Amino acid sequence: MKRAGNILAALQLALVVGHASAAEPPAVSVAQLAGSTLSAVAFVPRTAGMPGGGELARIMLQAYLAPDGRAVVRVWDTGRAAYTAPAERRWSLSGSTFCLDVPLAGPRPICADIHIWGPRIAGVGAKPYAMLDGDLQRGNVLGVH
């Protein structure tokens, strides 16, 4: 037990030192998202009617983020082993909080405080909890509008 406590203390120290010395990533802008396709995995609280078990549901998605706030979104349907038909939804960015309406995610959009590094995008949100991890590719790789 003492060894585990020492390891935990060392990890906490590394986290504090790393956080203090790490530069903040640049602010996220709409220009980084608009006109791109997001391919990502999101973890959200499981709601009634969602397949699977456990507290969190994993949603694999692709979304073309149009410059006007529209999004064309498709989600991987594990039961069919195929993507759902693309559906028109909405997306927004307020500060660093990115929100995307996603089929199968329940009545609320997935919202996360995001960071973007090159093609990578990742973030975590609260109320409700959400985790997003994926990449961005310029253009509409879904091929639908």
In which residue ranges do the predicted regions lie?
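Bacterial N-terminal signal peptides
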Residues: 8-18
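Lipid interaction determinants
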Residues: 18-88, 92, 97-145
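Positively charged n-region of N-terminal signal peptides that target proteins for export
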Residues: 1-4
